[in-house]
């Protein structure tokens, strides 16, 4: 397990920021994944290097018997009873009070970290099918800030040429045995919305993941209340500690049987789960973090749908880089609409937004100006051909 988490941590460390997403995406696939991985390493270190459980055994027990008892209770689960409650004589009732999640905490945390990274894997694998390699083009725009004027203009012209070729590629028919999602992405290339459609789909995937993670957290903890974090905080504010609430109890009970000379002897021992002190803080933090992240991710999804679907938002965004600039003050609204909706289309506007977000306003302005010049040149060329 320790080696597995070591390799997993190395993989997380190798994750790098990309320039084809926004800060909410990074909160999901980078920061949250890193936080959960750190928690998984801390818990696994305590479980597999330290002493996760220690039991109070009868004085007649030898050291090997004590070790056996602790190992057995760790593997077979323990159950919680308030300190002053009587131990039920019915063993079935004891089993109903069992706590069986603490052994699986590192594995569950590793699974959660992996699930948070799945949407960005989907984005990386499928974005190249859209026709526009957003990561490479935006990175080129970022790098152009360090170049001289002539080299920067050549770089921006290269970006503009790639965008034009990708946006105006003819529709290609996919064979029936391809994945439906890939087929849909290729089909949307002809409408210039493939990248936008894929990005919003990934946003939906992030939203579904974080909502599912909240339900997974409550299910894993076996908590009947969906407001686990608020319930724990309320208990702490009212001075109701784990001894009463049973949330991540430090002291539990364990039943086990030992066969001696053909006779079965049943023992009940009291055990200390120090690991639950860490688990309580970790899951309380994650519960609140997940809810905050769910709200931010949902707002980000609605925001991107709004700016991608509402035509006026696209016009206003592109227009601010063309109007008010010397030589572009006379751009009429009809020409702007044709430039945005027939030349750039949704994917072109999406790329400009990413350039503005990661490279800054100046590279975005220069790229928009280059695309506008190319659009005007193409329009004049067609008029001369006629």
Swiss-Prot record:
Pfam families: Innexin (PF00876)
Membrane topology annotation: Multi-pass membrane protein
Compartments reported by the entry: Cell membrane; Cell junction, Gap junction
Keyword set, alphabetical order: Cell junction, Cell membrane, Gap junction, Ion channel, Ion transport, Membrane, Transmembrane, Transmembrane helix, Transport
Molecular function GO terms recorded: actin filament binding; gap junction channel activity; gap junction hemi-channel activity
One cellular component (GO) term of this entry: plasma membrane
Transmembrane segment boundaries: 33-53, 103-123, 197-217, 282-302
InterPro entries linked: Innexin
Domain of life: Eukaryota
GO BP of this protein: monoatomic ion transmembrane transport; positive regulation of locomotion
PROSITE patterns in the record: PANNEXIN (PS51013)
Tissues in which the UniProt entry reports expression: Expressed in PLM neurons (at protein level). Expressed in the nerve ring.
Subunit-level organization: Heterooligomer of unc-7 and unc-9. Interacts with F-actin.
Function description: Structural component of gap junctions. Plays a role in maintaining gap junction activity to promote locomotion.
Family statement: Belongs to the pannexin family.
Protein name (database record): Innexin unc-9
Organism: Caenorhabditis elegans
């Amino acid at each position: 397990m320790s080696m597995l988490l070591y390799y997993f941590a190395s993989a997380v460390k190798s994750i790098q920021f990309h320039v084809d997403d926004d800060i909410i995406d990074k909160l999901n696939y980078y920061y949250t994944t890193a936080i959960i991985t750190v928690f998984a390493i801390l818990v696994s270190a305590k479980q597999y290097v330290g002493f996760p459980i220690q039991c109070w055994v009868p004085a007649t027990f030898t050291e090997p018997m004590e070790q056996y008892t602790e190992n057995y209770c760790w593997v077979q689960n323990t159950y919680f009873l308030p300190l002053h409650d009587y131990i039920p004589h019915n063993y079935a009732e004891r089993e109903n009070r069992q706590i069986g999640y603490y052994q699986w905490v590192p594995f569950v945390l590793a699974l959660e970290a992996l699930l948070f990274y799945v949407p960005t894997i989907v984005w990386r694998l499928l974005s190249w099918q859209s026709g526009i390699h957003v990561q490479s083009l935006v990175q080129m725009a970022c790098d152009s800030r360090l170049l001289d004027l002539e080299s920067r203009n050549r770089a921006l012209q290269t970006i503009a040429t790639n965008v034009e070729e990708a946006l105006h590629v003819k529709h290609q028919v996919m064979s029936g045995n391809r994945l439906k999602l890939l087929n849909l992405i290729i089909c949307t290339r002809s409408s210039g919305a493939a990248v936008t459609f894929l990005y919003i789909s990934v946003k939906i995937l992030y939203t579904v993941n974080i909502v599912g993670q909240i339900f997974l957290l409550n299910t894993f903890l076996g908590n009947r209340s969906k407001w686990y974090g608020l319930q724990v905080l309320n208990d702490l504010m009212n001075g109701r500690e784990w001894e009463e609430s049973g949330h991540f109890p430090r002291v539990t009970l364990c039943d086990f049987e030992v066969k001696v000379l053909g006779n079965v002897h049943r023992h009940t021992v009291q055990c200390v789960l120090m690991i639950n002190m860490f688990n309580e803080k970790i899951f309380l933090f994650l519960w609140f973090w997940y809810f905050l992240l769910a709200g931010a991710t949902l707002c980000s999804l609605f925001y991107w749908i709004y700016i991608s679907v509402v035509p006026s938002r696209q016009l206003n965004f592109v227009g601010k880089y063309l109007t008010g600039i010397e030589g572009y003050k006379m751009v009429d609204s009809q020409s702007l609409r044709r430039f945005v909706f027939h030349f750039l289309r949704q994917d072109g506007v999406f790329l400009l937004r990413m350039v503005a977000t990661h490279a800054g306003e100046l590279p975005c302005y220069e790229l928009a100006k280059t695309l506008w010049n190319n659009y005007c040149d193409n329009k004049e060329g067609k008029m001369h051909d006629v």
